[in-house]
Amino acid sequence: VLSVDFEGAESRLRREQYANEQVVHFCKSKDGVGLAWVENGSGPPIIKAPSWIGHLKLDWRNPGIAPVITSIANHYRLVRFDARGNGLSDWEVDEISFERFVDDLEAVFDAAGIERAPILAISQGSAVATAFAVRNPDRVSAIIMIGGFPLGRAKRKSAKDRERAEAMRSMMAAGWDDDYPSLRDLLAEIIVPTASVEERRQYAQDMKLMISPENIGRYRGVVDYLDVTDLLPKVSAPCLVLNCQNDRMQPIDQGRLLASGLPNSRFISYDSPNHTVPESDPEWPRMERDILSFLAEHAA
């Protein structure tokens, strides 16, 4: 029986369209660092917080990021930016820190002319969005947190977590430029294990283009030592907390800890091993429905 995946083909065409049509803008953060940002789609604004490493153009073929940004851009004006030190934003920067990540989010809110909007927060973007929402409660109408965590590995109770954090940071800084099979290939396997071999291989290659070996070590240090547990009770915006049950990048108990500390949150778990969810994951349609339903309530 011949089967044709029309929906998948349509999604790929839409992603190519978004990637080709987007115009890269630049703005300055408080300390003068140049930040690259884009917008796709139309309608009420949604802004994506910085998460893991990325690249505004390459994100459209990132198996775990492309589905969610495509889905949201199909219905809303989605504003995204590359965090300092990676992607199309400035790489030569004096400071890569959690506070600067929050400053950068504020700078893009201003540059895009957004007074108030929901935030799409993936991975450590959930912590950045938390801090931003506490600093600017009137500007955040809601937060979607995917694969989020309030405590970096080095701040967790387990000695094994702390040891892994140090080992991973050292390996990233030392072996980021290695050829296949590289640490980047291992990361792709951990982040999106159910993506196709070709998708993971491409993602691993793209990571090399997203950030320098020096900056990945600095970047990882910030992620490993973040701690927003004291800020969670101060977030007034409604939060949708989405985590996969068998996520190897960030354990689901971090998602539960995140949700339990937020005064106005809803927690949903998915039967998946992915950290970010590819379109081929059987749980993706349910996650997409949950996200769009939440945004229908809270996007102005």
What are these model-derived regions, one by one?
Residues E99-A117:
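Conserved acidic catalytic loop of the alpha/beta-hydrolase fold
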Residues S29-D90:
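Conserved HGGG/HGGXW glycine-rich cap/lid loop of the alpha/beta-hydrolase fold
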Residues D177-V222, L226, L231:
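Conserved alpha/beta-hydrolase catalytic His-Asp/Glu region
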Residues V235, V241-N243:
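Short beta-strand/loop motif that positions the catalytic acidic residue
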Residues A121-G125, A129:
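Gly/Ala-rich beta-loop-alpha elbow adjacent to hydrolase catalytic centers
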Residues R248-Q254:
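Conserved alpha/beta-hydrolase "acid-adjacent" motif
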Residues T130, V134, V140-A174:
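Flexible "cap/lid" loop of the alpha/beta hydrolase fold
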Residues S265-A300:
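Catalytic active-site module of serine/aspartate enzymes centered on a nucleophile-bearing elbow/loop
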